[in-house]
């Protein structure tokens, strides 16, 4: 059976979400076929972007001195990882500052089974699905005069994860924590405790993830593929998820069709040589 794969990341562009004090992606179009008379002219661009742009992965070094940087996170930690999705979107709909609690995670486990060790635990708040296309709505800093002492920015209001919940999933063996908001600490926090808890225990965090309703609580796998920049504490990433039962398998009919197509192509090439 062909695999149904879901892209859980957002397209990276000049309008992508990033931390408010950072610069957005900047693009320099070096040349195009239309602007070059050189033979074999091609499109070529250069980009400048913040490591925390759009859907991205935080390595331990993002907050932890001496912590691992992006290139030191192994493929085994990122590829074919069991996905566990904890949905608190109904509570966030009533309270933009809601933090997923340990009780929420425990209730999810009672309903769907224990979160397997080694999972990437995703907290679905519904925030990105509803607001990602508009930075102002996504940051939700409703009062510019209300300045957050910790960030020095107008206080943002978006959901996150409680420290107790983060500690609980890491204690349970979670490989990483993902969320569909700007960060798992929520719109305002004193000292980014969730970052320190998760990254301080040598796990990773994925932020600004698309966690649509098609993702079930259990039974899917994921691969997170950050841009592998040496020494980087964070990097933009692709994030794919698919049902575990498919395992990217293809049917015998598809194999046979590919084999027949290859034989026909070889025969056609032989006829051209002999002509």
Predicted regions located by residue number:
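Active-/binding-site microenvironments in catalytic and ligand-binding cores
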Residues: 1-275
């Amino acid at each position: 059976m062909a695999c149904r794969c879901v892209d859980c990341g957002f397209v990276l562009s000049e309008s992508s979400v990033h931390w408010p004090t950072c610069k957005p992606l900047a693009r320099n179009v070096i040349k195009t076929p239309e602007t070059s008379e050189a033979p074999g002219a091609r499109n070529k661009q250069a980009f400048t972007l913040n490591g925390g742009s759009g859907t991205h992965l935080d390595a331990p070094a993002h907050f932890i001195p001496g912590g691992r940087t992006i290139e030191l996170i192994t493929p085994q930690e990122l590829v074919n990882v069991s996905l566990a999705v904890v949905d608190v979107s109904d509570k966030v709909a009533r309270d933009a500052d809601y933090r997923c609690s340990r009780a929420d995670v425990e209730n999810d486990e009672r309903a769907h089974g224990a979160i397997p060790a080694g999972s990437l635990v995703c907290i679905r708040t519904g925030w990105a699905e509803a607001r990602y296309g508009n930075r102002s709505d996504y940051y939700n800093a409703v009062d510019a005069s209300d300045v957050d002492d910790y960030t020095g920015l107008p206080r943002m209001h978006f959901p996150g994860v409680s420290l107790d919940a983060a500690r609980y999933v890491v204690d349970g063996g979670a490989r990483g924590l993902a969320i569909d908001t700007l960060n798992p600490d929520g719109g305002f926090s004193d000292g980014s405790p969730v970052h320190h808890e998760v990254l301080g225990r040598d796990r990773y965090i994925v932020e600004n993830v698309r966690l649509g309703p098609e993702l079930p609580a259990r039974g899917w796998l994921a691969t997170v593929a950050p841009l592998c920049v040496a020494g980087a504490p964070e990097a933009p990433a692709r994030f794919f998820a698919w049902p575990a039962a498919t395992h990217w398998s293809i049917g015998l009919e598809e194999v046979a069709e590919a084999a027949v197509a290859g034989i026909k192509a070889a025969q056609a090439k032989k006829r051209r040589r002999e002509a």
